[in-house]
């Protein structure tokens, strides 16, 4: 089963999830709303495969934190 959570980090909001793949493993995914249209966009599709949605969700949160550190100029999230 997929796991999903709105994750706030340093004033930014992400939709983090652990999504089940056809193989049965799970992938970490990070999305957010981006201007100008506020459509939800995928920022990161994690490369790893996890045994369950909870593990993939935890990794998605880590990836969101890394994204904030590597994109300090993106204040509009």
Model-derived segments and spans:
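N-terminal segment of the canonical double-stranded RNA-binding domain
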Residues: 1-29, 33-35
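Acidic, low-complexity intrinsically disordered segments
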Residues: 40-77
